Amino acid sequence: MDTDVVKGKILQLQHYSVNDGDGIRTIVFFAGCPLHCRWCANPEGLQVKNRILYIASRCVGCGRCTAVCPRQIGCDLNAPGEREKCIGCGACVTACLEHARKNTVTEMTVGQVLEWLEKEMIFFRESGGGVTYSGGECTQQPEFLHALAQSVYDLGLDQAMETSGYFSLEKLQATLDLMDLLFMDIKHMDRDKHRQYTGVDNELILKNIAALGAQKKNIVVRIPTIMGINGDEDNIRRTARFVKQHIPNPRLELLPYHSYGADKYRQLGLSYEESAFRRPSEEELDLLKKIVEAEGVEPVSFR
């Protein structure tokens, strides 16, 4: 395979991570996602198209960005009417000396990603680590994902995938067979509430988890736990029972809600419903873990 031919849209490569799998890892964040979770911590990853983050506190109003912009957008990218004109070319990012603007998406070849990974091989080998594919939603770019995963597999590295589960299993099967671990989200067990909060129902997601469980894949189900949304005892219990029924080695990770992505919403000119979401307290989280255990499912943490 020519690793310089297949290209993908990447949000970032996060190096030396100790989350989302065993050992020291590089996490490859793919652009694009079919879900639109209202609490999403990575709103820049919802689209494959490049968008510009505008950090207003760094802007000095020098006008360099406007001078190179093909649409003559002013310094304040989030001023009324300006965002709509932006084509995401990134010329303003290059021109800005104050780093007040950032691209959200970078196009990379498989070979370019591998070059980064090869620099970190000693850390992967010594720690039992590897590569984790995340996003956005990594399965939104199936050709690039498979080409990269096959190359990493050929290097003998551990591979994990963090996914919403909203994909065509038939199209992704060959790629999934290369994975050592699958992190699969269940945002909510109620179909209508899942659609209300993410934009899609959960039918395909649950179907895929059940099918991959029947294949005896190594799966950890994750719940982004948000009080008032899906952190109630009934939803956690229903999720644990589903996991117990369909996954041979049932494990479930409760990921407490955080608002780390709030600044990104502002930098993209978007509103953020922070007041609508609440992080579970330690006492609430302990109670939910006990419910998971009572259903015969192991609570785990990769954080």
Can you name each region flagged by the protein language model?
Residues 1-22, 225-303:
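Auxiliary Fe-S-binding modules of radical SAM enzymes
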Residues 54, 195-201, 269-277:
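Short glycine-enriched, charge-decorated loop/helix-capping segments at active-site entrances
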Residues 38-45, 64-84, 91-107:
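Iron-sulfur cluster-binding cysteine motifs and their immediate structural context
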Residues 53-58, 78-85, 105-118:
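Short cysteine/histidine-rich metal-coordination sites, predominantly Zn2+-binding motifs
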Residues 9-11, 76-77, 162-166:
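Short gly/ser/thr-rich secondary-structure transition/capping motifs
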Residues 111-260, 266-267:
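Conserved AdoMet/S-adenosylmethionine-binding subsite of the radical SAM
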Residues 1-62, 66:
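Flexible, acidic/Gly-rich N-terminal and inter-domain linker regions that tether
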